[in-house]
Amino acid sequence: MRVVFMGTPEFSVPILTAIIGHGYEVVAAYTQPPRPAGRRGLELTRSPVHEKAEQFGIPVFTPKSLKGAEEQDVFASLEADVAIVVAYGLLLPKAILDAPRLGCYNGHASLLPRWRGAAPIQRAIMAGDAETGMMIMKMDEGLDTGLVAMAEKVAITPDMTAGELHDRLSMIGADLMIRALGALERESLALQPQAEEGVTYAAKIDKAEARIDWSKPAKDVHNSIRGLSPFPGAWCEMEINGAVERVKLQRSTLGEGSGAPGTVLDDRLTIACGEGAVRLATLQHSGGKPLPAQEFLRGQRVTKVL
């Protein structure tokens, strides 16, 4: 079976690796173009999928768009049986969707129709969902509206971070995709329509959302911290040894106590919220590495959280 793989971030890599490892012929990998990196933006960094595909000698294509006739002709010339799409980042026009003999199949990190869109992992945690999952669907022209081929549910534990859920769903996605490809080869892949009720959209995370609002209930603050960890990272300003510093918050738990929002309630960094309190467990100085709260506080006194 001739496969075109389309993906960009680290989340996509285990699925690509599994497809290669199970002997499928990956004739091309499509991924986002290299991005400027480094302090001055002078270096170009290739995507994780780009790096992995090159390790296996797979031709890599990095178009900025697939809307043009020339790019669509190149794609069609690959004569793919199927395209596998996992967090690619570009919209696929109808000409691309129709080119592979068996269609295009997408690995999506939610239980559709909940959390259609760009940031389903973060949004599920930020909303306080108790479960999510991984789905394989046959793509159509809508935004994550295609027929569902396979799904697996995953519990979201109370302190689970987006990073932990990301890794879990990525591995589940690899297993599901291999099972889906096998069923597709055997012509036994059953497709079901998504439910019409319960549609929500996982909008891309806005930078403004990363700043913690201590006037919100503790549960919402805790969900924001873990939903934005490790990237982009929730943050706040702290008064440390008399100076105000921006600090990233990577882990937290629900704490006990109350007070004016932003009040430091004890020497274990329990912070009062609009309702209840949150204990900060892992913090990160600007330009530093994540540290457990006890180590973060060594030689430092936090008097106020803004």
From Swiss-Prot:
UniProt cross-references to InterPro entries, sorted A to Z: Fmt, Formyl_trans_C, Formyl_trans_C_sf, Formyl_transf_N, Formyl_transf_N_sf, Formyl_transferase-like_C_sf, GART_AS, Met-tRNA-FMT_C
GO molecular function: methionyl-tRNA formyltransferase activity
Gene3D superfamilies in alphabetical order: Formyl transferase, C-terminal domain (3.10.25.10), Formyl transferase, N-terminal domain (3.40.50.170)
Record EC number: 2.1.2.9
CDD domains per record: FMT_core_Met-tRNA-FMT_N, Met_tRNA_FMT_C
PROSITE patterns: GART
Residues noted as binding (6S)-5,6,7,8-tetrahydrofolate in the record, renumbered to the chain: 110-113
UniProt superkingdom: Bacteria
Catalytic activity: L-methionyl-tRNA(fMet) + (6R)-10-formyltetrahydrofolate = N-formyl-L-methionyl-tRNA(fMet) + (6S)-5,6,7,8-tetrahydrofolate + H(+)
Keywords tagged on the record: Protein biosynthesis, Transferase
Family: Belongs to the Fmt family.
Function: Attaches a formyl group to the free amino group of methionyl-tRNA(fMet). The formyl group appears to play a dual role in the initiator identity of N-formylmethionyl-tRNA by promoting its recognition by IF2 and preventing the misappropriation of this tRNA by the elongation apparatus.
UniProt protein name: Methionyl-tRNA formyltransferase
Native source species: Brucella suis (strain ATCC 23445 / NCTC 10510)
Gene name per UniProt: fmt
